[in-house]
Amino acid sequence: MSLAGLHRPGGVHCGAVPALALKIVPETDLLLVISHRLHLHEFLPAHGGQFGPDAGLLPGDAGSGQSVGGGFVGVAQLHLIMGAQISQGALALPVGILDPVDGVGIIDQSIDGEVTGETPQHGQIIGSVIHDEGLIISPALLDSPDGLSQHLLMGLAMLPGVFRGDAMHRGGTLGDLHPGVGEQFEWGGSGIGDSHHRGGDDAGFKGVGGGGFQVEGEHVCGVEVGGEFHRGIHGFNPNQRPGHRVPPPDAIRDHLESGTVTDDNAQLRRTWNELAEKVRYHRDLYYNQQPEIPDADFDALFRQLQDLEEQHPELAVPDSPTKEVGAPVTEQSSFDNVEHLERMLSLDNVFDEEELRDWLARTPAKRYLTELKIDGLSIDLVYRNGMLERAATRGDGRVGEDITANARVIGDIPHELTATEEYPIPAVLEVRGEVFIPIEDFADVNAQRIEDGGKPFANPRNAAAGSLRQKNPEDVKKRRLRMITHGIGYSEGFQPASQHDAYLALAAWGLPTSSYTEAVETADAVVDKVLYWADHRHDALHEMDGLVIKVDDIASQRALGSTSRAPRWAIAYKYPPEEVTTKLIDIKVSVGRTGRVTPFAMMEPVFVAGSTVSMATLHNQSEVKRKGVLIGDTVVVRKAGEVIPEVLGPVVELRDGTEREFVFPEHCPECGSTLAPTRAEDADWRCPNTRSCPGQLSQRLTYIAGRGAFDIEALGEKGAQDLIRNGILVDEAGLFDLTEEDLLESDVYTTKAGAVNASGRKLLANLEQRKNTDLWRVLVALSIRHVGPTAARALAGRYRSMQKLVDAPVDELAETDGVGMIIAQSFKDWFEVDWHRAIVDTWAAAGVTMEDAETEQLEQTLEGLTIVVTGGLEGFTRDSVKEAIISRGGKASGSVSKKTDYVVVGENAGSKATKAEELGLTILDEEAFVRLLDTGAV
């Protein structure tokens, strides 16, 4: 057996759930404080009056409300303020604050209706509050039955389920609402019980007098009142976002085609945004809360983001999650912060034999240790004079949560170390380990959890992470947690010569070490261990998601050092994803921006590689035939840590004769036009109704609004569909001519009363602001085939004017560096179409800038040079380093070849650095790169 089958996961992530801290909507009474784990701390009803803990809140006063029910503690706040001003710190907020339980997940579920993802109707949240890239762009005005959005119903509208015109909340009627100065408001009625709100005992909320808040009843949605409101309150799964019922399959494929310069390259920015948001979201959950995906899934997403940034340096931003360790402890944490004595780093990953051997070649050692990578939760223990002083989570690597009380009830963690003659107890010892639930105990833990009225954990890793953060140590004790040590941080009085010696000492002191750790001396032996555990990964006591390889000699470890996030002397080999089977219920098609009609599989939900999936792209009808899948088949599904699952093929032996063949539609499902391939040899069938097909137009509008083009926050997929459905836009030409009067015909951008809402006002403001933008962004927004950001920058940089571009001969355009004849001809062909030219003319008439201002040209120190940048640079972002090269006449390339003149290597440099060494290319550090920029020489 070889490692050929143990390949690196790839793909893209769509539908990321954001992690924003604060969003203010100008000129409305609504402000969202978004977080991932919140406590209901305070509730302050006010209606243009004076309300506070003592009924004395005036505009500008510091309002803190009153603690709720005795058990609600924490820093997150739930305010609903109508027309009053609250001072929160130094910020006076003359707006309403709504802090929804568990943040955006609830917003997501509320806006999109039930899990089936139906279109929002009156009585639900009105407005496109979720951007197609997964970002909150504005809280919408909350429209609800009988105009109650003008009162306190907006607070309730963020709870699970949807409000409808009949005032039903998932089958349960709402109680009476009586907002007003000094009056009570109640949330009761039929209550929120099993039949009304998916579980839990009835709960009634009352606002009393001048702002007090009382909680009656025991549970809301099965979550104890007075405790922590978390994901269990609504069962939202970000991997099944109703808001993104299925990523447009042609967009999925567009993302995967990022290696060539096509019109689809602008999708890369969206792909990066989605991946980054997903990483940030799950990183926070992973380190600070209840994880929703396993370690393997998180690491695969992280690697995708790293690879994408390496391949396309222009995508990254300064605060990219690829430069950080863990996640900061949130203000909403129930635990105190504690600093690690020595920084707690992460691990870099490899996914195939080539990458592993490359690392081994770069990291020669006399002996390596191979250890199973436990799929659990990292823990940091500090012993002082042999006594357990404190335990903490990883946090951001420097500061974690103090979980000492919970650690003391884990049987594997000794309260006092045992000294031996060979290994006396150090004065200070910081131990690193992993907490987990044994596989054989997981089913029993889940069974007990269900019996207690809770929801089952998705996997042992999530169970361990959630258990370790319980507030009551007695609850932790019931979870059968185990711990295995895997290293030492800071120590006084103990300096081992090797990692192996450290493990011998830990075991002697009474700390558990792994029986699976082995020492090997050659690269081939390391590979053999990887192969062995690939076949025996389910034989271990615990779940494992890889094999960790460490340089054994401590002196060598110190010499190798570490990057900002991981040691250079250790690597984690990640195994390929799980493969599971499920039923293929149906095959449907979707229409993308370019008219490509793409089939996708609808499957019975199945858990694979850390999340539940129910849809997968099938690319085109030829692929459906190649895979041999029939509707009704049991199919094999693989998910390599990315969000996009893959249907590998059918389990033919399980067919019972009821399966049927998929018939590709003859007509576009969006507009009814006859479908056909552009050329006879094309595998993709397209809708020819380019201008008016609602499916294509909505995708183009969303693309125009994306960060790679005009970056119009308030225009997302739902908003685009609404503008088309209501006849407000017939093509993209009229986008910048939209007026408030036009938006009155919208469902998304108006209130139930018929006025333009906050999202509508923000859309108009965004459009006005974005009229003054760079020419290259305008070119990208036109969706000209093959003209992505790279070609657009090159053309705009050379001609600086749309008119000059249009007038330029095709041969001259083709001479532009990085363009060529294919792109040049595509550009000229696009302008041959009347309605295409009308888009440019109409935008220009509306005030969209069609030329770049003249700027002083920098000295062309890099003229004729091709430069590749890999890894992070301290003084540059991904975008700025590319701009620095291009503006000085150089070519910023994304791949290393013999034609590359220089390779600039920063932190966390990837395989490009290795390839540069193999090719004998000149490698520069950041200092040398800066000299090259300034002088043209190194």
Swiss-Prot record:
Any one GO molecular-function label of the UniProt entry: metal ion binding
Record: residues binding Zn(2+): C668, C671, C687, C693
Residue ranges of the region described as DNA ligase: 261-938
Enzyme class name: ligase
Alphabetic keyword roster: DNA damage, DNA repair, DNA replication, Ligase, Magnesium, Manganese, Metal-binding, NAD, Zinc
Start and end residues of each stretch annotated as Unknown: 1-260
The keyword DNA-binding is assigned to this record: no
EC numbers, comma separated: 6.5.1.2
InterPro entries in alphabetical order: BRCT_dom, BRCT_dom_sf, DisA/LigA_HHH, DNA_ligase, DNA_ligase_AS, DNA_ligase_CS, DNAligase_adenylation, DNAligase_N
Highest taxon listed in the record's lineage: Bacteria
Active site: residue positions: K373
Record has ATP-binding as a keyword: no
NCBIfam families: dnlj, PRK07956.1
Protein name (database record): DNA ligase
The organism of origin for this protein: Corynebacterium efficiens (strain DSM 44549 / YS-314 / AJ 12310 / JCM 11189 / NBRC 100395)
